[in-house]
Each structure stands twice: as C-alpha cells, then as structure tokens.
C-alpha cells in the first residue's frame, strides 16, 4: 500500500517507508529525551498498528506517563476510506487494541489525516471517547453536539505542525524555532483574558532528525522559562474544561 503523504503512489515505497521507520526506531526516543528534560508528557496520536509493531514505544511511553489517543489503524487509511457501515467497528477495534497495549482506554481521538465522516463524533462519543482533536477551529476547547455521551474539541495545531513547517513549506530549523516562539508569545499574551491551548504537533520522522531536534529543545526551553505555563496533556485539558466550563461555555473565571 502506498504511504499517505510520502509523495509516491507506488508500493513498495522504500524511501517513504525507511524515513518513517527511522522515526519509530530513532526519532521517537530522541523526542522522549527532550520532553523528559522539561517534564512534559506527550499526548500521543497512536495508530493501532504501532502497538502491534513497536511495543517498545508503548513501554517507554508508559514509563513517562504519556497519554495515548486513538488515531485509526494506520495513517495510510483515512476514516473516509472505509465503507460507512464499517466505521464504528474500526473505532471499536482501535480502542480495543490501544487499551490492551497501553493499559488504559483512550479518551481522545484524532483521525488519520484529520479525516472524519458526518458520523464520526457520534460514534466516538458512543464508544466512550470524550474529546476529539480534528477541529483546529479555536485556541480553547469547544463543546460539540452528539447523539449520546459527551464530546468536546481540544484543538490540534496546523500552523506550527512540523510536517507543514518542514515538509510542505520547506522552512529551516532556525525558522521553526522562531515560529514556535512567536506562536507561544501571542498565546501567552492572550492568556491574560483566558487560557489558551498550545498544541505542538511532533512527528518522530520529521523533528526527530539530528539536525532539527535541538531547535525543538531550544523552543521548549523558551516556553518553559515563562511563569504560569501548564505542562499538561490533552485529557487533562479536556477534564478541566468539563469540570469548569462544559455546562456554561461562556463563563469566564477571572
């Protein structure tokens, strides 16, 4: 099967595969070391097949108390690619595999390629998921209407996403560092009137390369040097929102 986003429509796609495999073999552990320096726990968008092929990643992530979100079976298959009648079964399968591998049922979800059908939020809520990240429409959590259960958006960031910055827009590592710091500066200023979510999407095969990783380290050092920065996970943000704002989204606690 061709690798989504690699630029090749052929299989086997050796360059596309080896770069991504490098991320699983080397890059992810390099990211672990950097995050650990700053006492940051990752919120991992976990393809279920990673649980089956790379158990060492799960083991090391659990040691660091990382959060695991559902992220489909594989990034090569969007939720939009499945027949409509199969989507719920796929969500259930992903939840079962992730729960079995990590020891905890995932509470969050981001679709491969941010893909959703009109039924996805309802299916997720029915299966016990409580937040979704596909909707990067705000800088704060947003409640969603679902048929059963409950659901909110904890926004995923596209602007300083390392794939967009490096692969699609061809920025340098130095420019990435400056972009992340500028992004943070604006959110930090705006947080005076209400908290903001700074989601920093990292892909091990992108930011985990040797000549890029130190710029992530520099950016995190800058961010964490500021007072009042909450180094937290997606679920902890969602849980806070549910406990304080879900029933009255317009309320502000000064």
Segments from the language model and where they lie:
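A structural motif
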Residues: 146-164
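Catalytic alpha-helical scaffold of carbohydrate-active enzymes acting on polysaccharides/glycoconjugates
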Residues: 1-152, 177-200, 206-254
């Amino acid at each position: 099967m061709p690798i989504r986003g690699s630029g090749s429509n052929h299989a086997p796609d050796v360059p596309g595969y080896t770069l991504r495999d490098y991320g699983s073999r080397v890059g992810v552990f390099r990211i672990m070391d950097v995050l650990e320096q700053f006492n940051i726990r990752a919120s991992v968008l976990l393809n279920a097949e990673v649980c089956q092929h790379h158990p060492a990643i799960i083991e090391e992530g659990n040691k660091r108390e990382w959060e695991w979100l559902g992220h489909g079976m594989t990034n090569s298959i969007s939720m939009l690619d499945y027949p409509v009648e199969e989507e719920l079964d796929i969500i259930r399968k992903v939840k079962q595999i992730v729960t079995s591998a990590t020891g905890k049922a995932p509470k969050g979800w981001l679709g491969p390629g941010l893909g959703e059908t009109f039924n996805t939020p309802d299916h997720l809520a029915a299966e016990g998921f409580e937040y979704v990240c596909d909707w990067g429409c705000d800088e704060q959590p947003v409640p969603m209407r679902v048929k059963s259960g409950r659901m909110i958006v904890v926004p995923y960031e596209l602007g300083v996403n390392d794939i967009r910055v490096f692969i699609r827009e061809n920025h340098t590592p130095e420019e990435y560092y400056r972009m992340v710091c500028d992004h943070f500066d604006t959110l930090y200023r705006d947080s005076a009137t209400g908290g903001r979510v700074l989601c920093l999407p990292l892909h091990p095969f992108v930011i985990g390369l040797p000549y890029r990783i130190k710029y992530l380290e520099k950016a995190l050092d800058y961010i964490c040097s500021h007072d009042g920065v909450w180094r937290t996970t997606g679920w902890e943000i969602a849980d806070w929102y549910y406990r304080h704002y879900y029933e009255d989204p317009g309320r502000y606690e000064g």
